[in-house]
Amino acid sequence: MKTNTLLASLSDYFESYLPEVKGFSDNTITSYQYAFQLLFDFLYEEKGLPPEKVTFDSLSNGTLLEYLAWLENKRGCSPGTRNLRRTAVASFAKYALKNNFGDALQFYSNVKDIPKKNTPKNSDIKYFTKDEIAIILNAPDTRSPIGKRDVMLLSLLYASGARAQELCDLTLNDIYFGTETNIRLVGKGSKARMVTIPENSAMMLRNYLSSKNLNTSSAKDRLRHVFSSQTHEHMSISCVEAIVKKYVVKSKNLYPHLFKRKTYTPHSFRHSIAVHMLECGESLVVIKAFLGHESITTTTVYASVTPELANKYLRERGKPLESVDSELPPHENTRTATLSFLSKQHH
């Protein structure tokens, strides 16, 4: 049987090339893995192709365009997220061209011919109002261990402005209780930042860890993850997504006149704290540091949320707003579970 050069190339690409040759961060590799998990999902659902049957020849220009349209129309991805998925596929195409010239030449050409999609200026930011945050944080049933975990997770998503992956990776070693409680978050490019959380969140965190018999002073507990799923000690992004979706649906059913946006994700909590900080008069420079943005340009998108915030920004800065793409993490794809290179953690 002829070896599937596409799958072999993908395996080398994710297991050796990206982490060892390119030195990409875990978060970037995970993002690229998700792009291919979703591509295989699309090919199975829409084309009837299981992962082991997908070859370079399967990835025609038309099929790739259909995949990108599927991301937007079926999964509700923004143009910015669609572009990120395209970039992941294009990056692999360049690698495959160098290593499998004959097989990958047409595939590379197909990807290269697909332009990035223009993203609208100041596109809609999916954030929660302060009332909506209060409702969601009251949604879990804290009489159960799962409910206690979920309310802590949702509270910390908001209080820390953490990305979903940052919260999944949080260990007891990253928590510093004291006069102020700080947590260490490792973000894009493996860059770490310290974030101070409010006193009420700190008290919740102490009580939560105590309920799980975890002690930040204990050497054996220091490397334990703060949040775990029912099956894994290290929670996945898809699990965080499912938790957020569960309580958004519950809250929408209870308060149908609120939660007007079509979709919300874990990133909505990060957006929310940024908007609420700006509404309370915090400067964009402080918010930039809090969120771990490399450029102030990224942070300025929050000033476009309301006319009042836009006017406040223009008075302070005197220049127009610029847009920024924000990646939304996809759901877990069980069909690709046998492809270990699409789920392997690189540390």
Where are these regions (language model features)?
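Conserved catalytic core of the tyrosine transesterase superfamily
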Residues: 1-347
